[in-house]
Each structure stands twice: as structure tokens, then as C-alpha cells.
């Protein structure tokens, strides 16, 4: 006898729903793999030791442009992490997919992270409270040699804090997937680097001005240089608590008299405190209470200011203007994801209120109804042409935050509605506009006259499909019910392709099989 999960189609509604979710999860994951593989083929060049992503490719030819910046390259790492997480989550439902792809993507992930070294540079940064040499900082453009990234070019503007934040997030995910402590250690270094960009000068009330500038060469403080680090900070808190809860860190800051001082802090608590502090700062300064979405930035004068001389020279505070700029989906998405993590760790119900608020107003504020083929779709922001704008990835950041929020206790119904609309739009584009296994940025409108695309857009779509697979898998787990099925030699068993399977109760493959008109899930 073999234990299985047995679904009597059209007979047991709860189990039928579970199989529906499982089928959708596998379909989403399969499409993620298809798009990611096509993107790696068309948008990447070079050898394993000198591997790079091109900026633009063409679905109708082999034409490509030069190397991409570190931001799109990081999105390719993200896509691999998302697919690997989905493969692990669906290992029992889709063992063939797991066996075929898991080791391949682990190997490819290692290659991608190793070749980050072409963006890496080092320099001595004079910040608000410290003067320190950082050996692992990633430049915007790719260098021709490892470790020669131009992190000081254009008056420090060729490295920005948000790039380090996105990388820290994906390196933590890579560490969780592989156990490679090098990834964890780099993520910690990058996190400490961006925290060093926190404006710790105090105002006339003794309060920190707070906020992290866009980069060490900027005075403006952006949603994208604050919100993205909240989730990684909470993750690092979890990791340090689990691995070395007594780990200490020397933190430099400015005291009530604006003098530089330091204190020894527990590293795990330090990360959680900063996650809460950055979240509170961004909500106070960039939240639009009218739209319930987040502004882009606080502007400021371009000229950096310093105090002191020689070894005592430090960066000075520069006043910022009021909130301004377009409300982009990703800037609200990072706050939604941050609220989910902070609710999980702190239990503070104020974060739950924020989750519900953002889940609702992202749906009503960023998506709009579109009639197409007699049906109503919800269209999320897109760009006029594939070579202008980044809305495909911005939407991806918001969508993955909805996946996070959907797993929180008593999730908002807007989470499911939003995720359903993302999935529906991707499927529409896949069914109507797929070219060379790639999708147009206008999922509902198609390619038009364009055949060019960016790998950045395509890895975003792959990430979305992979995270949707995880969302569907969770829904299946909530719906599945278990019964026992007795193996009989006289029964014919088939895989989902209709191919007959040979074997005994002990040798039938794990995963979804079909027997006597019933779908079986073999554990």
C-alpha cells in the first residue's frame, strides 16, 4: 500500500481546489523557467569567469548592446533565487522539474554571484560619523577587470545605496538556498555600508534627521534608498539570532550634542532597530496620506558639505525639501514587504494596519481596469517603449510584496485580487504575444512594432511567475486534504503527459499521477 493524496475530481470541492492551485503553481513555475532560460541565452555573454549581461537584446535576431549596469544584473540573480525557491516549494508536486533544473540553477547562481566581482570596488568613505575603507562596494557600471569597479567616479555618484540594498536582499536569499556563508558575509558588509549612510546628525530638538541619501555622492533622500533595506535587515536579524545571538558590533553615531561617539550593540538587535527606524522615517517623510502611496524622494542641494579637517573630517547634514516625485509601485512595495517582516518579528499591530492600507491602495492606485476581448483586466504600470523606463521590474517588486503579505495572518483580500491580476496579465501575454520565449513589456497590448527588449524586463517576468508559483503552492497547502489509496497491480498509472508508468507501490515516482480517472499525489 502506498500513501497518496487523492483527489476525486468534481466530487470533493476542497481537494479539487487544491489540485487546481497545484496545477497553476506548476504552470507558473514552468513558464518562469522557460522565460529565464531564454533570457540567459539571449542576454548573457562570455565565459563562466567573465560572464556579463547585455543591456538590450532582440527577439528577432542575435543583436545585442553592451554590458548592463549592476541593477539589472542583480535582477537576474533575483530571478534565479525566485525560481530556486519555487522549485524547492514544489519539489513534491513537480519532482521532474526539480530534478531537471535545481542543480543547474544553483550552479548558474554561483556563476552570477562570482561575476559580480566585475562591479566591485573599494574606497575610503567619509560619512556622517565615520571614516572607513569599504572593500566591497558595487559600482553602477561594469569594469573590465575584477575588483576594479568605479565606485568613486563622478564625485561618488557611480555607487548608490539602493544598488547595495537590492544586492544584499538577493545575497541573503542565495545564502538561504545554498548555505554559502560568503554570500551571507557580503550581505552583512553591504548592509553595514548602507547603514553608514544614515544621517545621524541631530536637529534642534535632539532628534536625528535620519534617512539614507541616494548614495554617498547625493544629499537627496529617496524612497528607493531607504525602503529596500528594511526586509533584508529583518532577515539578517533572524540569521544572526539563529547563528550567533551574542554577536556584537561597534556603532558610530552622533550624540545629543552632535559629537561623534560609539557604543557596542548586539548585532541582531542593531539590525532590527534600524529596520524599525528606517521604516518609521520613510512613513513620516514620504507617505502621501491622500493617495496612501509613497512619494519618490526628498530633494536637496547637490553640493556635499563637510565639517572638520584631516582625519576628523566628516560629512555634514544638508537640509532636504519636501516630498516630491512620482509614486512608483516598487517604492510602496518595499514598505509593504517591510511591514510584513516587522509584523512577523515584533507583533506590533500597527504594521498590520499598514499592510491592509497599502494592499488596498496599491491595487486601487496603481492598477486600472482595461476591457479586452470582452473581459476586464487590471493593468499595472507599463512603459511607452521597451528601452525607456523600468516599470516591469517596479511591478515585480510590488507583486512579490503582495506574495509576502498574502502569507501574513488574516491577509487583506486585496492581496489575492492583486496577485490574480498579475497572473492573468502574464498569462494573457504568454498566450498571445510570446516571442522567442519572451514577453512584451505591455502585457495586454503586445509588442507593437518593437522586437527589442531588455533582459531586465524578462528576468522580472520570470521572477513574477516563480513567486506566483509559490503563492499558488501556499493556497494548495491550505486546501489539500489527505486520504489513503490502495495500490493495485491491475490499475494503470500515468504521468500528466499521459505516458504509462511501470512499477510497484514502492517504485512509482513521487509527484502527480493519474489512475482510473483520478489525480494522485504520491508522497
Residue ranges and their predicted role:
Residues 209, 216, 224-233, 262-339:
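Active-site cradle of extracellular carbohydrate-active enzymes
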Amino acid at each position: 500500500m502506498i500513501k497518496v493524496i487523492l483527489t476525486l475530481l468534481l466530487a470533493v470541492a476542497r481537494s479539487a481546489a487544491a489540485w487546481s492551485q497545484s496545477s497553476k503553481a506548476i504552470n507558473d513555475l514552468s513558464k518562469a523557467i522557460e522565460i529565464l532560460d531564454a533570457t540567459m541565452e539571449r542576454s548573457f555573454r562570455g565565459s563562466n569567469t567573465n560572464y556579463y549581461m547585455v543591456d538590450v537584446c532582440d527577439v528577432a535576431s542575435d543583436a545585442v548592446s553592451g554590458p548592463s549596469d549592476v541593477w539589472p544584473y542583480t535582477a537576474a540573480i533575483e530571478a534565479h533565487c525566485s525560481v530556486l525557491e519555487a522549485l524547492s516549494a514544489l519539489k513534491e508536486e513537480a519532482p521532474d522539474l526539480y530534478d531537471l533544473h535545481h542543480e543547474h540553477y544553483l550552479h548558474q547562481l554561483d556563476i552570477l554571484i562570482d561575476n559580480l566581482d566585475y562591479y566591485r570596488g573599494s574606497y575610503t568613505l567619509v560619512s556622517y560619523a565615520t571614516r572607513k575603507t569599504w572593500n566591497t562596494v558595487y559600482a553602477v557600471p561594469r569594469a573590465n577587470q575584477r575588483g576594479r569597479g568605479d565606485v568613486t567616479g563622478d564625485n561618488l555618484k557611480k555607487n548608490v545605496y539602493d544598488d547595495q540594498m537590492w544586492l544584499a536582499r538577493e545575497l541573503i536569499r542565495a545564502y538561504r538556498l545554498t548555505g554559502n556563508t560568503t554570500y551571507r558575509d557580503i550581505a552583512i558588509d553591504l548592509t553595514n555600508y548602507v547603514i553608514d549612510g544614515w544621517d545621524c546628525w541631530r536637529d534642534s530638538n535632539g532628534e536625528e534627521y535620519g534617512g539614507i541619501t541616494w548614495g554617498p555622492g547625493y544629499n537627496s533622500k529617496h524612497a528607493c534608498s531607504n525602503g529596500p533595506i528594511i526586509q533584508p535587515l529583518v532577515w539578517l536579524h533572524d540569521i544572526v539570532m539563529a547563528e550567533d545571538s551574542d554577536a556584537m558590533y561597534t556603532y558610530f553615531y552622533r550624540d545629543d550634542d552632535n559629537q561623534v561617539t560609539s557604543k557596542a550593540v548586539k548585532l541582531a538587535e542593531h539590525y532590527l532597530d534600524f529596520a524599525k527606524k528606517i521604516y518609521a522615517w520613510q512613513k513620516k517623510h514620504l507617505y502621501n496620506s491622500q493617495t496612501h502611496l509613497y512619494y519618490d524622494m526628498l530633494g536637496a542641494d547637490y553640493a556635499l558639505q563637510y565639517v572638520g579637517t584631516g582625519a576628523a573630517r566628516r560629512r555634514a547634514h544638508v537640509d532636504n525639501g519636501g516630498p516630491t516625485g512620482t509614486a512608483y509601485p516598487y517604492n510602496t512595495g518595499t514598505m509593504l514587504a517591510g511591514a510584513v517582516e516587522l509584523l512577523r518579528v515584533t507583533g506590533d499591530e500597527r504594521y498590520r494596519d499598514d499592510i491592509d492600507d497599502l494592499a488596498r491602495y496599491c491595487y486601487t492606485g496603481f492598477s486600472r481596469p482595461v476591457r479586452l476581448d470582452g473581459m476586464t483586466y487590471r493593468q499595472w504600470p507599463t512603459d511607452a517603449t521597451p528601452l525607456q523606463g523600468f516599470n516591469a521590474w517596479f511591478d515585480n517588486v510590488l507583486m512579490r510584496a503582495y506574495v509576502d503579505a498574502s502569507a501574513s495572518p488574516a491577509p487583506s483580500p486585496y492581496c489575492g485580487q492583486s496577485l490574480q491580476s498579475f497572473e492573468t496579465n502574464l498569462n494573457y501575454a504568454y498566450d498571445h504575444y510570446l516571442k522567442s520565449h519572451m514577453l512584451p513589456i505591455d502585457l495586454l497590448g503586445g509588442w507593437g512594432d518593437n522586437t527589442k527588449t531588455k533582459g531586465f524586463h524578462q528576468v522580472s517576468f520570470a521572477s513574477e511567475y516563480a513567486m506566483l508559483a509559490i503563492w499558488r503552492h501556499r493556497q494548495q497547502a491550505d486546501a489539500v486534504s489527505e486520504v489513503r489509496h490502495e495500490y493495485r497491480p491491475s490499475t494503470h498509472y500515468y504521468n500528466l503527459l499521459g505516458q504509462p508508468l511501470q512499477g510497484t507501490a514502492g517504485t512509482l515516482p513521487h509527484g502527480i499521477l493519474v489512475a482510473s480517472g483520478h489525480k494522485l499525489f504520491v508522497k
